[in-house]
Amino acid sequence: MIIGIGSDLCDIRRVERTLERFGERFIQRVFTETERRRAARRPAQFAATLAKRFAAKEACAKALGTGFRRGVFMSDLGVVNLPSGQPTLALTGGAAERLAALTPPGRSAFVHLSLTDEYPYAYAHVIIEARDGA
C-alpha cells in the first residue's frame, strides 16, 4: 500500500551559488555525515551530488505530507544506500515520528527513492510503501 508520494526538481546551479555564498555552513546544516562523505568522494560532481540529496529530502518531506514543518527538518532525512547499492532514505527525529504515524498498525514502512541528474537539474522521486508485517 502506498502511503506517500513526493518529487522534487532542484537546479544544480542554485546549489553551486549557495555553496559559493555559504560553503561549509550550508553543507553542515543540511546534509548528514554520510551524505557529506559521499559528495567529497566526487569532487567533479560535488554540487550535483548534493543537489540530488537536497531534492531527495524535499521529495521525502512532500511524501510525508508535512514539507519542512511540524517537526520535520532537513537534518532528519539522509540519503543512504542499501547493500545492493539502491538509494533510500534514513529518517530520524521528527521525520521518523511522522513516518511512524503514517504507517498503519501491523505494517512496516519502506522508502523507495529514485535519483537522477542532467546538468543543470537534479531530480528525486520518493514513494513510501507500507508493507505487510512489522
Curated annotation (Swiss-Prot):
Q: Does the keyword Manganese apply?
A: no
Coiled coil where? none
> Per its Swiss-Prot or TrEMBL entry, what cofactor is needed?
Mg(2+)
A cellular-component GO term for this protein? cytoplasm
Q: Which domain of life is it from?
A: Bacteria
- What are its GO biological-process terms? fatty acid biosynthetic process
**Annotated compartments:** Cytoplasm
Group of enzyme by EC = transferase
Residues annotated to bind Mg(2+): 8, 58
EC number(s) of the enzyme? 2.7.8.7
- Name the keywords, alphabetized: Cytoplasm, Fatty acid biosynthesis, Fatty acid metabolism, Lipid biosynthesis, Lipid metabolism, Magnesium, Metal-binding, Transferase
Main subcellular location of this protein, as a coarse class: cytoplasm
Reactions it catalyzes: apo-[ACP] + CoA = holo-[ACP] + adenosine 3',5'-bisphosphate + H(+)
Gene Ontology molecular function, alphabetical:
holo-[acyl-carrier-protein] synthase activity; magnesium ion binding
Tell me which Pfam families the record gives: ACPS
Q: Which InterPro entries match?
A: 4-PPantetheinyl_Trfase_dom, 4-PPantetheinyl_Trfase_dom_sf, ACPS, Ppantetheine-prot_Trfase_dom
Q: Which family does it belong to?
A: Belongs to the P-Pant transferase superfamily. AcpS family.
General function of this protein: Transfers the 4'-phosphopantetheine moiety from coenzyme A to a Ser of acyl-carrier-protein.
Known HAMAP family for this protein? Answer: AcpS (MF_00101)
* Name under which the protein is recorded: Holo-[acyl-carrier-protein] synthase
Recorded source organism is: Acidiphilium cryptum (strain JF-5)
